[in-house]
Amino acid sequence: MAEIRKGDTVKVIAGKEKGKSGRVLEVLREDGRVRVEKLMTVKRHQKKGRSQANPEGGILEMAGTIAISSVMVVGKDEKPVRREKIGRELGAKEKARLQKRKTAAK
């Protein structure tokens, strides 16, 4: 199973956002949840003067969290990644996360 990290592209496999994909903004390991860009948006009502970022207050929209078990890591081609390792590609000087896919033999 691939470990989910910030910046990964994931696809939702369960829940009301099933089938949608996005980039991971934050991983909350203690809660077992992830925050995915443009998915599970929630509205928060904020009073005037409560925040330096939004001093006028109002209704804010932000990304909610999704359970880690409800998402899977996908590659650039939107296919699931089964295994990954840290290593060097041929001719590369820096280490990177290399992804492998399990192909079904028929």
Swiss-Prot record:
GO cellular component, one term: ribosome
Gene3D superfamilies: 2.30.30.30
SMART domains: KOW (SM00739)
Record keywords: Ribonucleoprotein, Ribosomal protein, RNA-binding, rRNA-binding
Region ranges (Disordered): 84-106
Biased composition (Basic and acidic residues): 84-97
BP GO terms, sorted: translation
Source taxon at top rank: Bacteria
Subunit text: Part of the 50S ribosomal subunit.
NCBIfam families documented for this protein: rplX_bact (TIGR01079)
HAMAP family from the UniProt entry: Ribosomal_uL24_B (MF_01326_B)
Family named by the database record: Belongs to the universal ribosomal protein uL24 family.
PANTHER family, alphabetized: MITOCHONDRIAL RIBOSOMAL PROTEIN L24 (PTHR12903)
Protein name: Large ribosomal subunit protein uL24
Name of the gene encoding the protein in the UniProt record: rplX
